Amino acid sequence: MAAADDVWCRETVPRVMELVSPRLPQRDACALLAVSPWCYRVLVANPKLWEVLDLREMKNPGDRLISALSLVRYRHLKVLNLEFAQDIEDRHFIHLKEMSGISLEDLEFLNLNACQKISDKGIEAVTSLCPNLRGLSIYWIVGLSDSSIGHITKNCKQILDLNLSGCKNISDKGMRLIANNYQGLKKLNITRCVKLTDDGFQEVLRKCSSLESLNLYALSSFTDKVYKEIGSLANLTFLDLCGSQNLTDDGLACISRCGGLTYLNLTWCICVTDVGVVAIAQGCRSLELLSLFGIVGVTDACLEALSKSCSHSLTTLDVNGCIGIKRRSRDDLIKLFPLLSCFKVHS
């Protein structure tokens, strides 16, 4: 009996833990290390478990990060999540840079969202450690400037996905750095980067022609110069133009050349009329989500046009506040778009 118990503890339980752990949140998987010495050995020896380090919203994230990266098992880390780890500071990244033997060469994605105590110096330090980074999210770190973009473009040459949402001090200078260094960029989010102008962002659109996802939420200063340039992005599938108050039907007609669009948010694009939406209907025949929320210049005519081209694909349609559309009850909309399951994008 004792021998059977010994086999159970030494072999069966660790094997079960090894099978279960990849399906658990990382924090739960880490807790399994304390079950027994045998579980510890088996789990530590599984490299897949240690490709992600999730310190989201944790207390003392800087000290935890330094401790974790000192361990051999995190030598091949691919994803580091520090989102809302608000006590992380420049000094933690600078300390990592100065430590011998610390390398993040395998890191592919870094999430620093809302780490408000990070400055340009912190960005310089952390990006110097991860030259092969492919995705970087620095949402709502309002103190960052174009200097951070300079550090990112200098240290991380392979970025494909860049989220700058809420970085209000980024200017056209930063956009030019992106345009000149990331011509293979796939995803860009510049929500509320309010210092940007047509001139700077046009350079991005001209040089980053592989863009698939573009989020321009709450950027009311751009004009049709930018929107017409978007029409040249042949691979674009996601476009958020919420609050683009200067977008006209002419600009939207150019965007209709993006035939692969599946997501288009035109909420509060107040200059748009049926003319622009009909152009979208004719050019973008694979739309799955479309928001026309708050546009008073559109009528039932644009929905008729959309139903001819997108009834087979559209699952989300928001026409709330579109007072020119008279037949906008759920029943009316489902008659035109049988696959609709969502009728509100914005609450």
Where are these regions (language model features)?
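C-terminal interaction modules of eukaryotic adaptor/scaffold proteins
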Residues: 286-290, 297, 301-347
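N-terminal/domain-start segments enriched in small and hydrophobic, helix-friendly residues
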Residues: 274-292
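N-terminal adaptor-interaction module of cullin-RING ubiquitin ligase components
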Residues: 1-101, 105-114, 119, 123-127, ...
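A structural signal for leucine-rich repeat
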Residues: 68-72, 93-102, 123-129, 149-155, ...
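Conserved hydrophobic beta-strand positions in leucine-rich repeat
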Residues: 53-55, 78-83, 107-112, 136-138, ...
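Short, solvent-exposed loop/turn at the beta-strand->alpha-helix junction
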Residues: 35, 59-65, 86-94, 116-121, ...
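Alpha-helical scaffolds that organize eukaryotic protein assemblies
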Residues: 110, 121, 127, 131-169, ...
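Inter-repeat linker/turn residues at the boundaries of leucine-rich repeats
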Residues: 48, 75, 86, 102-105, ...
